[in-house]
Amino acid sequence: YDKITIVINTFNSDDKIHLCLNSIESKTKVIIVENSNNVNFKDELEKKYTNLECILTGQNLGYAKGNNLGLSKVKSKYALILNPDATLSKDTLENFLVTAEKLSDFAILGPAKQDEYSKDEYNIDKNQIFQVNSLNGFAIFLNLNQFKEVGFFDENFFIYLEEIDLCKRLKSKNKKIYLDKKVIINHIGGSSHNENINFEMELSRNWHW
């Protein structure tokens, strides 16, 4: 999948990142932005996964700045921003690509979500693609040429609300955001687990301040 680069923003994610990475097709480019100076983490990942580049930030940048850094390194047409506590299904990327080529004018595509709490988050036909106002940031598929005017995440946000702000700015420029029920991404811990990751990042930032 040379049209897609996956960007994963991590912070002390050693215990969950391998499940995520093992679910990704080995030919797909992956950029990890690790919010620390953990050289062992970088070396271990780059040795095990030849499709992966790990950037060490040396400090906790947060969701917006970390993902923007990763996106600045992307050279492909599309990027998938993925949480480290999410895993792809075997046809996730293929389904994203099929929909992307069909729609062509979209800015963001979002998946249906499956986790232990919610096996079917949207009670609609599973083949349906429909426009939405915003998406959950645990997995968002970006059509990068649609972001030249808007930019990516506002770095004034450290944790929470970044994806909502981005979606609002996209909508203000008449950019289109879709949810595709055919695309399934498993969110391992569900929303509460994701909040724990964000809470750890927030605690770390406050501690350093």
Over which residues does each language-model region extend?
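A conserved acidic beta->alpha catalytic loop
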Residues: 23, 34-42, 59
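Conserved donor NDP-sugar-binding/catalytic core segment of glycosyltransferases
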Residues: 87-122
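Short, well-formed alpha-helical segments that are part of the catalytic scaffolds
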Residues: 10-26
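Active-site-adjacent helix/loop segment of glycosyltransferases
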Residues: 168, 172-209
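Acidic helix N-cap motif at the loop->helix transition within catalytic regions
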Residues: 16-18, 39-47
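A recurrent flexible, glycine/aromatic-enriched loop bordering the glycosyltransferase active site
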Residues: 125-145, 149, 164-166, 194-195
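Glycine-rich, basic loop-to-helix element that forms the pyrophosphate-binding segment
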Residues: 56-74
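Short aromatic/hydrophobic "clamp" motif used to bind/position activated sugar donors
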Residues: 79
